[in-house]
Design a protein with these regions (language model features):
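N-terminal Rossmann-like or analogous alpha/beta NTP/dinucleotide-binding catalytic cores
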Residues: 1-101, 106-108, 137, 177-191, ...
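Residue-level signal for inorganic ion chemistry
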Residues: 27, 58, 90, 114, ...
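Active-site cores that bind ATP or allylic diphosphates and position pyrophosphate for catalysis
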Residues: 76, 92, 96-212, 218-222, ...
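Conserved phosphate-binding loops in nucleotide/dinucleotide-binding enzymes
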Residues: 146, 164-175, 203-235, 239-248, ...
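Short alpha-helical scaffolding segments that buttress acidic/His motifs in well-ordered protein cores
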Residues: 235-236, 280, 335-342, 349-352, ...
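Small-residue-rich helix-loop
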Residues: 289-300, 313, 317-406
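Charged substrate- and nucleic-acid-binding regions of tRNA-handling and nucleotidyl-transfer enzymes
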Residues: 391-455
Length: 457
């Protein structure tokens, strides 16, 4: 069997759509699984949109996702002379002809058309969709060269596939109609027709094509929002394919080993932002503990805290932690609590602000719901008295105090006001772990302040 060669052939516009990058992922995995070549072709014939900046955005997205290509980047604009030479061949063989056409703007010019066969059936076996067929008479002749002399997508695409020796074309099923036309061009040129695999589209929860109206639709947006490239890669792979069991989080090596085009789903794949966020959280959990801890330390610097020093691992609200080993242990404990709960890397500084500074915002809705209720002030002051007597300031000891107060009726009436009083938020890491991290002095001071300024009598 000859070497398998696949290509990703986007038209750079400055933004890379998740549907396009999923096609790149499938092409890349197929090449790696079969030991073939993954080629990158930049279809840059739209000179207004395919700027150097737009092309660089494409490269950056692919490198961020680990989609490395095997040969020099192929630029379609550099092959225009060859495209037109092939058009001349088609004209000479009678497979193309020139005709005068008037544009929508009223301009008249000569357009080169491809002559479709008038009888017979165009057929191919799609690796994903199965046998596909269409009567030749149902497809009209189509343009391959504009009146300005520039080659159109159909001819450029086929010629470049021939020149790059592409054996398999894996692309979206919005190209199925183009494929019938392209097969006719391949045959007219006496070239071998590649194998095709058309991928189902990505849809929203209403079954319509996923677009920016449904949320982030471009790779760059996910990068800015704190998604890990491994998570986005993994999730997009599963939009139309699975390993044959219930595994969802896979290593890159497992993906390469297991990926087969024959297992790609025929039906449309629904994009679920919540599932992607969950997967991102799973990949965040895989970050080495020390690495994640140091991310937190650095992010604390953005909150104006002296805790941002990696050298000292300072803990500005805990002067009682005098030894470096104690401070590192404090950061390790905080990181462990946050790492298992966080879904995104953006906003880490904000999520730990209450641990590194007394200057943190209060969520007004949480204050209204949890603190501005009758009896909350007395509840907080009672807790201050009880917490003052705790000898071992640890999560288990503090939880025992609240459990005793609740008398088996649930700790919610105490837990929620305490959380808002000491952190300004209605959610976060475990409350008693939070109190252990804040330490005795900070916890008691914040409870007193909330009782005096925020809580209702």
């Amino acid at each position: 069997m000859s070497e398998i060669r696949v290509r990703f052939a986007p038209s750079p516009t400055g933004k890379v759509h998740i549907g396009n990058i999923r096609a790149a992922i499938y092409n890349w995995l197929f090449a790696r699984h079969t030991g073939g070549k993954f080629l990158l072709r930049v279809e840059d014939t739209d000179l207004e949109r395919s700027t150097p900046e737009a092309i660089q955005v494409l490269f950056d997205c692919m490198k961020w996702l680990g989609l490395d290509w095997d040969e020099e980047v192929f630029y379609q604009t550099k092959n225009v002379k060859r495209h037109l030479e092939v058009v001349d061949q088609l004209l000479a063989s009678g497979h193309a002809y020139k005709v005068e056409r008037t544009s929508r703007e009223g301009k008249t010019g000569i357009v080169t058309m491809f002559r479709m066969p008038k009888e017979g059936t165009i057929e191919f076996d799609d690796i994903v969709k199965g046998h596909m067929a269409k009567k030749a008479e149902d497809i009209q002749d189509f343009a391959i060269v504009r009146s300005d002399g520039s080659p159109i997508f159909h001819i450029a695409n086929v010629v470049d596939d021939i020149d790059q020796r592409v054996t398999h074309i894996i692309r979206g099923d919005d190209h199925v109609e183009n494929t019938f036309k392209h097969i006719c061009i391949f045959r007219a040129l006496g070239a071998e027709v590649p194998r095709y695999a058309h991928l189902s589209m990505i849809v929203n929860q209403q079954g319509k094509p996923y677009s920016k109206r449904d949320g982030a639709a471009f790779v760059g947006e996910y990068r800015e929002q704190g998604y890990l490239p491994e998570a986005l890669f993994n999730y997009l792979l599963l939009l139309g394919w699975n390993p044959g069991d219930d595994r969802e989080v896979l290593t890159r090596e497992e993906m390469v080993k297991l990926f087969e085009l024959e297992k790609v789903h025929v039906t449309a794949a629904m994009f679920d932002p919540k599932k992607l966020a969950w997967m991102n959280g799973e990949y965040i959990k895989k970050i080495p503990a020390a690495e994640f801890r140091d991310m937190l330390v650095r992010s604390s610097a953005s909150e104006g805290s002296s805790s941002g020093s990696l050298g000292e691992y300072a803990v500005s609200l805990r002067p009682d932690l005098r030894d470096a080993s104690e401070r590192i242990a404090w950061w390790d404990y905080l990181a462990a609590q946050i790492q298992v709960r966080t879904k995104f890397l953006t906003g880490l500084g904000d999520s730990i602000r209450c641990f590194v500074s007394d200057d943190f915002p209060f969520d007004e809705k949480a204050v209204e719901k949890r603190l501005r209720k009758p009896g909350v002030k007395a509840l907080l002051l009672d807790l201050v008295e009880r917490f003052e007597k705790v000898a071992d300031w640890s999560a288990p000891a503090l939880e025992a105090v609240v459990k005793e107060l609740s008398q088996g009726n649930g700790m919610g009436p105490w837990v929620h006001p305490i959380r808002v009083a000491v952190s300004g938020r209605g959610e976060g890491i475990g409350l008693f772990e939070m109190l252990q991290l804040l330490g005795r002095e900070t916890t008691l001071a914040r409870l007193r302040k909330a009782a005096d300024t925020l809580a209702m009598e």
